[in-house]
Amino acid sequence: MNILDALDAQSKRTDLPDFRAGDTVKVHARVVEGNRSRVQIFQGVVIRRQGDGLRETFLVRKISFGVGVERTYPINSPAIDRIEVVTRGDVRRAKLYYLRELRGKKAKIKEKREKQPS
């Protein structure tokens, strides 16, 4: 392993949950306003995960007052306080860009059901 890989491994976050495209997540991001900071919660559907290592990002989409809002977050950003997975989505694609054109019930993602141990 070279020096850059070792630095990347040190900077990578391990406290984040496992999530993928289709999951509904709450992103608790620290926002600095002037001399004070607060935590802002952004809840929406993960549209994509992209990249690998320190440069990995994910895109979250929500509808706010009838307008679609999308935010891209770096996974290893220190500005992210924590990520909560609200629901697991059952989708067959890695990138859900088609949700941008859908409205109402058509934009709803089926919830993944956990298998019961027998």
Swiss-Prot record:
<dbReference type="GO" id="GO:0006412">
    <property type="term" value="P:translation"/>
</dbReference>
<protein>
    <recommendedName>
        <fullName>Large ribosomal subunit protein bL19</fullName>
    </recommendedName>
</protein>
<keyword id="KW-0687">Ribonucleoprotein</keyword>
<dbReference type="GO" id="GO:0022625">
    <property type="term" value="C:cytosolic large ribosomal subunit"/>
</dbReference>
<comment type="function">
    <text>This protein is located at the 30S-50S ribosomal subunit interface and may play a role in the structure and function of the aminoacyl-tRNA binding site.</text>
</comment>
<comment type="similarity">
    <text>Belongs to the bacterial ribosomal protein bL19 family.</text>
</comment>
<dbReference type="InterPro" id="IPR001857">
    <property type="entry name" value="Ribosomal_bL19"/>
</dbReference>
<dbReference type="Pfam" id="PF01245">
    <property type="entry name" value="Ribosomal_L19"/>
</dbReference>
<keyword id="KW-0689">Ribosomal protein</keyword>
<dbReference type="GO" id="GO:0003735">
    <property type="term" value="F:structural constituent of ribosome"/>
</dbReference>
<dbReference type="InterPro" id="IPR018257">
    <property type="entry name" value="Ribosomal_bL19_CS"/>
</dbReference>
<dbReference type="InterPro" id="IPR008991">
    <property type="entry name" value="Translation_prot_SH3-like_sf"/>
</dbReference>
<dbReference type="InterPro" id="IPR038657">
    <property type="entry name" value="Ribosomal_bL19_sf"/>
</dbReference>
